[in-house]
């Protein structure tokens, strides 16, 4: 490890600040273009020790778990909460511009469709049993450390409000010292909670988890892998007026507004098309909307997702 002072020139595609040095580029998380920082360097990775010049585009992060000063560690769920919206949005747009240009495609790229705090309806978190109880949160980048979260400002309140319940379920169903995961989706009928990477719990643990779900309002389904443990309400999402029940852990667009914006774009471009093939159709995000104006052939490798289209 060495120490040096560097000037951040840009933000790389992975979200880290990039500085040029005599030994090549070094990537420094939680920095911004124009900032001068003293870093501890290991190969091409730098950790900020202090700032001697900060960017006027730097803002206070919304989340108490974000960044090197984050509570419980630097949560790996977000990378750029410290950047003002305007330059951040343009950075994301330029990623698309660069990707197209690399393939020889020159075209206009629209401004970023910005999602707001509290809109994300789908999160995947990690859990681990410890001597002190259960830890629920996101992995710190480049480590196996789970940052225990008390809040998640990007997620819908329906998810954040149930974090204590998800912890309890993890405490009941978990075993051993290996981490496991949970995907939580907010649906119209309640939360769809899907645990993964778990050993099969015994009958007592299953019943305890079921009883907990029955006592809690707002829980639609609890699954272990592909096994439905309890389903008080069938999880339902709205794809353009068609109600669909996705399988456990199914892919959904992160926010409903972004999904609608994408669907409007697709529908507009394909208006007048008699036949459409929807590759990687998932649960029908686009297929079911397109079916109102065209004959659609939906293609999807995941059988449970495709089964959700069988209305």
Give the ranges of each region predicted by the language model:
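Terminal RNA-binding accessory module
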Residues: 1-71
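Rossmann-like S-adenosyl-L-methionine
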Residues: 2-9, 13, 172, 198-311
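Extended interfacial segments that mediate partner engagement and assembly in macromolecular machines
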Residues: 52-56, 60-175, 179
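Carbohydrate-binding surface patches
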Residues: 184-198
């Amino acid at each position: 490890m060495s120490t040096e002072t560097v000037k951040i020139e840009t933000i790389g595609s992975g979200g880290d600040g990039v500085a040029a040095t005599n030994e090549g580029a070094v990537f420094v998380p939680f920095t911004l273009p124009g900032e001068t920082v003293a870093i501890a360097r290991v190969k091409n990775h730098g950790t900020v020790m202090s700032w001697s010049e900060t960017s006027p585009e730097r803002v206070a992060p919304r989340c108490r778990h974000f960044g090197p000063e984050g509570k419980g560690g630097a949560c790996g769920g977000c990378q750029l909460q410290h950047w003002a919206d305007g330059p951040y949005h343009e950075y994301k747009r330029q990623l698309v511009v660069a990707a197209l240009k690399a393939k020889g495609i020159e075209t206009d790229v629209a401004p970023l469709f910005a999602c707001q705090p509290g809109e994300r309806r789908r999160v995947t978190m990690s859990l681990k049993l410890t001597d002190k109880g259960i830890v629920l949160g996101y992995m710190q980048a480049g480590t196996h450390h789970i940052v225990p979260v008390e809040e998640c400002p990007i997620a819908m309140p329906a998810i954040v409000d149930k974090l204590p319940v998800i912890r309890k379920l993890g405490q009941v169903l978990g075993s051993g010292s290996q981490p496991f995961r949970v995907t939580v989706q907010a649906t119209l009928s309640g939360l769809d909670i899907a645990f993964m990477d778990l050993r099969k719990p015994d009958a007592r643990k299953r019943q305890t988890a079921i009883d907990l779900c029955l006592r809690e309002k707002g829980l639609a389904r609890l699954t272990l892998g592909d096994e439905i443990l309890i389903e008080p309400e069938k999880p339902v999402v709205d794809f353009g007026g068609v109600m669909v029940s996705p399988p456990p852990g199914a892919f959904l667009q992160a926010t409903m507004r972004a999904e609608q914006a994408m669907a409007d774009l697709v529908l507009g471009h394909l208006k007048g098309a008699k036949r459409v093939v929807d590759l990687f159709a998932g649960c029908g995000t686009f297929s079911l909307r397109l079916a109102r104006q065209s004959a659609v052939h939906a293609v999807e490798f995941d059988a449970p997702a495709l089964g959700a289209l069988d209305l």
